[in-house]
Amino acid sequence: MGMATYAVVDLETTGNQLDFDDIIQIGITFVRNNQIIDTYHSMIRTNLEIPPFIQALTSIEENMLQQAPYFNQVAQEIYDKIKDCIFVAHNVDFDLNFIKKAFKDCNIQYRPKKVIDTLEIFKIAFPTDKSYQLSELAEAHGITLANAHRADEDAATTAKLMILAFEKFEKLPLDTLKQLYYLSKQLKYDLYDIFFEMVRQYDAKPLDKSYEKFEQIIYRKQVDFKKPTTNYNGSLKSLYSKAVDQLGLTYRPQQLYLAETILDQLMHSEKAMIEASLGSGKSLAYLLAALMYNIETGKHVMISTNTKLLQSQLLEKDIPAMNEALNFKINALLIKSKSDYISLGLISQILKDDTSNYEVNILKMQLLIWITETPSGDIQELNLKGGQKMYFDQKIETYVPARHDVHYYNFIKRNAQNIQIGITNHAHLIHSDVENSIYQLFDDCIVDEAHRLPDYALNQVTNELSYADIKYQLGLIGKNENEKLLKAIDQLEKQRILEKLDIAPIDIFGLKASMNEIHELNEQLFSTIFTIINDSDVYDDDIHRFHNVFTFETKDILKDLHAIIDKLNKTLEIFNGISHKTVKSLRKQLLYLKDKFKNIEQSLKAGHTSFISIKNLSQKSTIRLYVKDYAVKDVLTKQVLEKFKSLIFISGTLKFNHSFEAFKQLFNKDVHFNTFEVNTSLQSAKNTSVFIPSDVASYQYKNIDEYVASIVSYIIEYTTITSSKCLVLFTSYKMMHMVQDMLNELPEFEDYVVLTQQQNQNYKIVQQFNNFDKAILLGTSTFFEGFDFQANGIKCVMIAKLPFMNKHNAKYWLMDSEFTSTFKEYVLPDAVTRFRQGLGRLIRNENDRGIIVSFDDRLINSNYKNFFEQTLENYRQKKGDIQQFGKLLRQIQKKKK
């Protein structure tokens, strides 16, 4: 890191408008030689009002600035401290531009010689982090950040993380460090100087034995699993007793009963359905059952979960805790398909790719560091998104395996016999094919959160043709000899001529003409689809914010598909008899496109269920064509039911109408299931009230203003009485945003933070919601499950409408052919399940107290009300107007105290 001094700066401001907002706090942490050597901190007075959101975010109130200096009073002092330093900040543009503007207003010209963005550093140094938000980085790396969004603490935390990153860089093998230096020249800021100094000062030594080398890549040596050591002669009951005692948990007979039930089903190779509701301790129960089964039989068990979060919890928290508590060494491993694991040949190809793109360059640097760390080579560890993911997926699709390639999937296969517990998720479980030998090694499977299986199966059987994807894939080939793969082919042809390579001549001009025609044919195809949309009945899917066309003629689409497939075939003929690796890459890309079009063509010809989706009705580029290739029931039967000798489905919401029959109907094979119900140990009836307003008008689709106003009135009543946070669940974005707009205009919510669901931001929003004392979270179907609501006071969940999927929802359309009565057999059970999941957001432990408000009068007035009423049997129910609602809140508040 050298002897340079780094000024790590963080600012808090009244907003993000450079020309209108002011700095209200500055924190600077000075770093030299990987040590914090000094700090500076000051509140900054402003004549502007501090918005309520900023006050809530920073905990800085206007009275705290009354004795603080204005910036012009400390500007020279700050400038003198940082003028010779390397300027560092997290998301550096924001802080640098604000401080330069503030200096300029004081007639000080500040131009740092070097600038470092820690967002850039942390993406490279910590490639597997799920988020690069400062608070989440701090938590992930064990750094205490008590008051996020306070400049002094944020600056210190950023500095500590930067030191961690630099120390990590310095420990890397020299060859890796050199490659990082060369790649860093393409970054936005001055990180290349840092890498240069690290390379220059590197203490040369032989490559550590924990590493191996493939071509130019240094990677972590793979260490095979040892056979498991779990010598145990006792019963499951004694194993359970020891586990809960060592883990400091409460001994719960129902949890033991659940574990014993699972073990019994495994031992007898049975198929079972178990509804184990909230509080039954499913995870520990099935882990102990799987472990005991392995001890007694030597067989290993596959556990499939719904989310990556639960996967991580099992592998990184629950199983290590069990190992420590029981003094065992349980071999557990994440199991996926071959395409989910990296090969070093693929990384080598990516590093050699001359694509000039900032995100791709960051990805290359991330790969170099990640491969020195990862024991598994699981690509999802990288959490790729956006352009990086599209680029990476394309590279996988077109990768031609290198000779002597090192593929991490082979390591997983080699060690599968020594695995006691395999962890996977529903998507991989359903996606795995017959040739996937890892899954074939498991005879027994436990499926947690089994009620979600149909959704993953539907995704699996639905094929998609997207304008954006095809345009991107074609762009990777290029239109002329100066672009992408065409450029590589052009260079190969020149090399053939100059060096007299032993390959056939390549018709570059013919290839270029063919590619231009393919581009034009693709435009014609999507123009045809665009015309169909404009001439058809279009239905809004408000949940997913798309417009759908369900009924349309496919004749013109098939004509265009045939033309583009024919042209792709003729283009592929250009490369007949040529086996050079550059040609193979282009052929593979063309074959990928051909297969994409061909699969859609075959499905449409066969009359499979299809629909067209468009995000923006005026933009052809947002079109997607979907075709359902197989029945969900067929896939669930083949990929799940028939794959294992013993199979146990577990969920808190597996039953409908007091029966498991609805779930059984998801399989098209008549198989006997043993069924069990494990009641929760939480006394939800004592803790939870369900309030059904009697003064809210019935929902009217064409006029929802009155309905929305009623919801807002109840939110006001709740927050006024309790000053607590509230989760409001909607079935449409339209209604959610109407409520949001009204809340933001009302003075009652000036000291509240109103958070709204945003695409790809759910994790961040949930964290914010749980951190604020006064917050209202507005969300749609995503938040009906899998969301841990944390609050110190009363907890409240308001359900705007019962969670029925709209008749014009794509799921409804795609599943319609699989049921005699789609509403009764699919839509109604799905709505009841989601409603039950929504109720489950409230009471997460024995100490929780709260209230559920359901505004939809169909809960008590519809023909199917009894199905929902069954879900409320364990809750105290109350009907009344808003005054009675307030009275109930005061009673609950009194009990909470």
Curated annotation (Swiss-Prot):
Q: Provide one Gene Ontology biological process annotation.
A: DNA replication proofreading
Physiological role: 3'-5' exonuclease.
Q: Its family? A: Belongs to the helicase family. DinG subfamily. Type 2 sub-subfamily.
Motif DEAH box extends across 448-451
Could you list this entry's UniProt keywords, alphabetically sorted: ATP-binding, Exonuclease, Hydrolase, Nuclease, Nucleotide-binding
The domain of life is Bacteria
Task: Give all residue intervals belonging to the Helicase C-terminal domain.
Answer: 703-893
Which molecular function terms from Gene Ontology are attached?
3'-5' exonuclease activity; ATP binding; DNA binding; DNA-directed DNA polymerase activity; helicase activity; hydrolase activity, acting on acid anhydrides, in phosphorus-containing anhydrides
Q: What class of enzyme is it?
A: hydrolase
Concerning Gene3D superfamilies, the annotation shows: P-loop containing nucleotide triphosphate hydrolases (3.40.50.300), Ribonuclease H-like superfamily/Ribonuclease H (3.30.420.10)
Question: Can you give the residue ranges of the Exonuclease domain?
Answer: 8-161
User: EC annotation?
Assistant: 3.1.-.-
Q: What is this protein called?
A: 3'-5' exonuclease DinG
Q: Which residues bind ATP?
A: 276-283
